[in-house]
Amino acid sequence: EIDKLNKWLFENVNNAVYRAQFAESLQAFADGYETFFTGLDAMEERLADKRFLFGDYVTDSDIRLYTTIARLDVSYSRNIGPCKHRLVDYPNLWGYARDLYQIPAFRHNTYFKDFAASVDLNEADEEYWENTYYDIVVQETDWDTIWKTPTGRESLSKDPAHKFKAEK
């Protein structure tokens, strides 16, 4: 089941946003864009009664979905044009993303400032740094405080004290 969902996530979420972003025709853009947001809609619905994609514990599928949704508002939204929805417009996905962010391995490997940069910051030329969005919005936003806001999603779990099956 995990492998099946991972394949679906790749086709309908993880790669769909890139198909829109790097499309070479309007039709290819529209296909990627619609597939991406339809995929997010499906995940929003799936997470309505589950803490994580397969219930009580984090799986590989959760990691795969998180890597895309963590970038939605700070990166992808600027690269694919007006978005149908922001992450916060999906209450289940937004709470789910923040719930995962509470886990140190997620939090310590989520680099919002890097996600917001449209180039490798180590190779950016001087002109790149004259970027209002990056200089003001990204630098002055307290991402950690926003994302560490409690979610209450533990109430969806039969084992709320544990996020990983191995912790039992």
Stretch-by-stretch model annotation:
Residues 1-168:
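C-terminal alpha-helical interaction module
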